[in-house]
Amino acid sequence: MDKYGLVIEERLSSLLEKETENATDYHDFIGRLYGDLREYTFRRGKRLASCSTLLAYKGFNGEVDDRILDVCAGIELYRHSILLHDDLVDDDEERRGGSTIHKKYSHEHDIRFGGGLAVFAGNILYALAVKAFSSSGFESSKIVKVLSLLCAIPQHVAHL
């Protein structure tokens, strides 16, 4: 599993590096936020969802290609968007040994700023996940199915 996790992390790193550069070109503060999101996303986790997806794909297709690596990166971005919002809702101080985004920015600015920024930051990760899925190179009909599932998840959670 570690071998596949590293391959996924390489793709995730490449995607986030490009996005961080673009964000920094736009504004230094936004670039810093993207850097913090990159650090948050790379805190050591199991990457079970993305690794399972990669292994299932390899089992059916016999190989790992760029398309599935983009999808796996999207899965990680999506998962971390949920975790970031969960940290805010639960008012967690730490996630995997590091400060949560809302606490980090609350300490630097104020509570309202940190909380608001965390909502936007989670949404940024969600948007990056959608971008990774959309640009994966899979057929449009498959991408639409995946994006429909992603949109349905928050609705189901809200009904719990």
Regions found by a protein language model. Name each.
Residues 21-29:
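Membrane-interface helix-loop junction between the first two transmembrane segments
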Residues 29-160:
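Mg2+-dependent prenyl diphosphate-binding active-site environment of isoprenoid biosynthetic enzymes
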Residues 1-21:
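N-terminal amphipathic/basic leader segments beginning at the initiator methionine
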